[in-house]
Amino acid sequence: SEMCIRDRSITDNMFLGREIRQKGFMGSFLKFLDKKAMADEARKRLSDLGLLTIQNINQLVETLSGGQRQGVAVARATSFGTKVVIMDEPTAALGVKESRRVLELIGEVRSRGIPIILISHNMPHVFEVADRIHIHRLGTRLCVIDPKKHEMSDAVAYMTGAKPVSYTH
């Protein structure tokens, strides 16, 4: 699922529903947006996450790579007092390099103390970034495992039913 509006700029995507209005009559009455303040703030947020490889903050999101789009979505998600970030298959359909950048972003967001719920079938990625793994099958949580104490093959065996779950780890 797309996390950005493709035919809008990076800045517009960063401020969806939270646009900064101009000061005074132009902003309060005529509702004019302060595009410069929005661009400056978007640039700062992307820079904070190490994402300023993007040349033009006003370029359309559809011109970005999949990894860059994920970066814009993560920057937006962490910019407005977010208490938790939910990422559903964030590396699906991305190349190796872009997937690596998304995993780095997850680490950067976690280092700020923002918890992340990562929904993924990519076990190497899950084991790399998770501090605990909730394993579900057919809509029911089977168990919670610690990736430092369990092998990836254990997780896959629980998911597929090859290994019965007799207790929560």
Where are these regions (language model features)?
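Glycine-rich phosphate-binding loops of nucleotide-dependent enzymes
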Residues: 1-2, 6-167
